[in-house]
Amino acid sequence: MAEGSFSVQSESYSVEDMDEGSDEVGEEEMVEGNDYEEFGAFGGYGTLTSFDIHILRAFGSLGPGLRILSNEPWELENPVLAQTLVEALQLDPETLANETAARAANVARAAASNRAARAAAAAARTAFSQVVASHRVATPQVSGEDTQPTTYAAEAQGPTPEPPLASPQTSQMLVTSKMAAPEAPATSAQSQTGSPAQEAATEGPSSACAFSQAPCAREVDANRPSTAFLGQNDVFDFTQPAGVSGMAFPRPKRPAPAQEAATEGPSAASGVPQTGPGREVAATRPKTTKSGKALAKTRWVEPQNVVAAAAAKAKMATSIPEPEGAAAATAQHSAEPWARMGGKRTKKSKHLDDEYESSEEERETPAVPPTWRASQPSLTVRAQLAPRPPMAPRSQIPSRHVLCLPPRNVTLLQERANKLVKYLMIKDYKKIPIKRADMLKDVIREYDEHFPEIIERATYTLEKKFGIHLKEIDKEEHLYILVCTRDSSARLLGKTKDTPRLSLLLVILGVIFMNGNRASEAVLWEALRKMGLRPGVRHPFLGDLRKLITDDFVKQKYLEYKKIPNSNPPEYEFLWGLRARHETSKMRVLRFIAQNQNRDPREWKAHFLEAVDDAFKTMDVDMAEEHARAQMRAQMNIGDEALIGRWSWDDIQVELLTWDEDGDFGDAWARIPFAFWARYHQYILNSNRANRRATWRAGVSSGTNGGASTSVLDGPSTSSTIRTRNAARAGASFFSWIQHR
C-alpha cells in the first residue's frame, strides 16, 4: 500500500448482509441529525452515520474495483461520488488485458534478469575456483595444535619505507593469496594462525621477517573481528536495486584479514617496527561496531563494480602481475561499499523513460564515510606502475534502477491521471481551492517529475468527458479550481438547496461591482438590511450570515475581505475573489441586476462598457491558454486514449448527480454553477476580434442593431441561466435600492 494511505478493516460485510437485515440500522439513525442537511452546501460536512460506515465496510467485499475506497482517506470524504467515479474511469476489458500482459512481461523480464545475474555469478565463482586450483602453492603441513594453513598476516603499524620493486614471482604469489581468500570457509568464527614459516611461504619472501618480530600473533588474530563472506546471491546479485521502497539489502561483511594483507602487497609486512602485544593492538584499534541506530540510517549500499571485478579476473587468469597500488585501489573500490548515511534524502521519483536511468550519485555526490581500515596508521604504498583499468561505457554498467524502472507506459500515466480526476472532483465538493502540494502528496507521489503530463491528461479527461475545466487561479500559491466549460448540467433544473446562497452571493457581487469593484463592510451590511438580513440574526436557510460572508465565501475564494489602509478605527472592505472572476463575469452579474429590475443592461452605460472590456480580456486569456495547452498536448501525444471507459456525462446525471428537494446528492463540481453566462464565447470565437469589437462599440454607442446585440448577450437558455432566474425569483426585491445610473 502506498505511503500516506490507510485501510478500513473489513469485517466480512457484504451487500447481501444488508439485504438480509444483519446488523440493521434504524431509520432514525439515517435521517435524524444534520448529517445530510449541509451535505451539498458550501462545506460543512456532517459526520458519517453508522449506515455510511456499514456501506463502506460492504464496499470492501465488492472486489478490487472498489478497493480504492478504503485505501485513500480523501475518498472517504464523499464515498458515493468516489464509487461512481471508480466505475466511470474503469478500464475496458481490452485495456485491462493489455495492462495485465505488460505487467506480466515486466515481471518476467525482471525474473530473467535475476536468473541471468545469478548464473553469471555462479560461472564467475567456478572460474575463480579453477584459477585458484591451478595456481595454488603447495605448503607443508605443520604438526601440532595449529595444523590448518592460513593466509593471514599481522597488520603493520607505522610508516613503511618504499621497498624495491617486487619480482614477477612475488606478484604471482600475491595473486594466488588474494584468490585464496574467497575460498575460505564462511563458518569460521576466528582466524587460525600457522607457523611463521608457513605464513612466509604463503605471503612471499619479503614477509617472513615481520613474523619474527611480532610476538603474540595469536592474540592479535583473536582480537580481530571475525568475518564471513556473504552468500552467493548477496555478493554477485548486482542487479538488485538497493533502497527501493524503503528496503535495504544486507551490507557486505568486512573483508577477511587475508584479503587485507593481499591488498597491501607482499612488501607491506617487511621493515615494520616490532608490534606490541595483541591486547595493545586491540586497544589502539578504533571501535568498528556500528550502533543499531546508525545501521538503520543506512539508506542504500552501492553495488560492487562489476567491470573492475571482470578486469581482475582476466589478470588472474593470465597470471599477469598487477601493481600493488592498482590492486589496493581495485580492492578498495570493489570490496568496500559506499554507504550513504541517513538524513535528508534526495527526491524519490519513478523515471518512466528508458533513456533516463540516472542514479542518485548524479543528483548528489555521496560522501564516503571513513571505514575501519582508513582510521589505522597509513601505510606507504609504492606508486602505481600501470593505470587503472578503464571504465566501461555507461551502458555496460548496471543501474540500480534496472528492475524498478518500467519503460515509459502511457497506461501508467493515464491511470494516475484518472486518480487525479477523482481526487479533484471530490475535493472540489467543498468549493475550496485545491493546492498543488496536496495533489503531489495525495495522488502524484513518486511520479512528481511527470506532474505536468499527468495534470494535463487529467485536464483533458475533465474537459472531454465531464465538461469541466481545471483552472489555476493563483500562479504563486498554485491553487486550482474546477469550472464548467459547456452546458454540462442542462438537466439540473428547478430549485436546489444552494439557491439561497447562490442568490446571496450574486447580490454581494453585484453590490461590489456597482460600487466601483469594492464595497466597504458598512455599505454591504446596509444593503443586506434592506433585504431583511442582519448579521446578528441567524437565518433559517443561510445560517450565521457573518460567518458565511466573512469566512466561508472568503475560504472558497469567492470574496476577498481586506482591511482598509489607514483606517482608524479599522474598517474592512469586500472585493471579488479569484474564484468569482473565473466562474462568473461582470456582464452576467449586470444582467442579473437588470433582470430583477426589468431593465436593459445598457442603461448602466459605464458598467456595461466595463463588463464588455472584461469579457474581451477574459476571452483573450482563454484563447492564449488554449493555444499553449494545444501545443503541450501535441508534444505529449495526449489524445483519445485519455477517454478510456464506458461512462458518459449523461450516465453521471442519471445515476447520481441529480439533486432533488429531498436531498440525495448533488452536482459535485458546480455547487454554485457559474458556467460562463450563455457561453457567448461560442458565438464570437468564429469572427474576427477587431470587427467584433467595432460591432459591439457601434451597437453600444449608437443604439442601432440593438436586436443583434441583445441576442449575443442573451445566448442559449442554459441551466446556469435557469438557476439564475430561479435565484432571481427567490429575491425579486434584492436590487430595489440600486439607483439608476
Swiss-Prot record:
Q: Where is the composition biased (Polar residues)?
A: 1-13, 140-151, 187-196, 701-720
State a GO cellular component annotated for this protein. Answer: nucleus
Q: Which tissues is this chain's protein expressed in?
A: Expressed only in brain and ovary among normal tissues. Isoform 1 and isoform 2 are specifically expressed in glioma cells among cancer cells. Detected in some renal cell carcinoma samples.
Does the record's keyword annotation contain Metal-binding?
A: no
Q: Which GO terms describe its biological process?
A: negative regulation of transcription by RNA polymerase II
Keywords from UniProt, A to Z, are:
Tumor antigen, Ubl conjugation pathway
**Which portions of the sequence form the region Disordered?**
1-27, 136-206, 247-296, 323-379, 700-720
Q: What ranges does the record list as Acidic residues composition bias?
A: 14-27, 354-363
Record InterPro entries = MAGE (IPR037445), MAGE_WH1 (IPR041898), MAGE_WH2 (IPR041899), MHD_dom (IPR002190)
Signal peptide annotation: none
User: Keyword Transferase, does the record have it?
Assistant: no
List each copy of the MAGE domain by range. 413-611
Q: What does this protein do?
A: May enhance ubiquitin ligase activity of RING-type zinc finger-containing E3 ubiquitin-protein ligases. Proposed to act through recruitment and/or stabilization of the Ubl-conjugating enzyme (E2) at the E3:substrate complex.
Q: How does it assemble?
A: Interacts with TRIM27.
Q: Which PANTHER family match?
A: MELANOMA-ASSOCIATED ANTIGEN D4, MELANOMA-ASSOCIATED ANTIGEN MAGE ANTIGEN
Protein name stated in the entry: Melanoma-associated antigen D4
Give the gene symbol. MAGED4
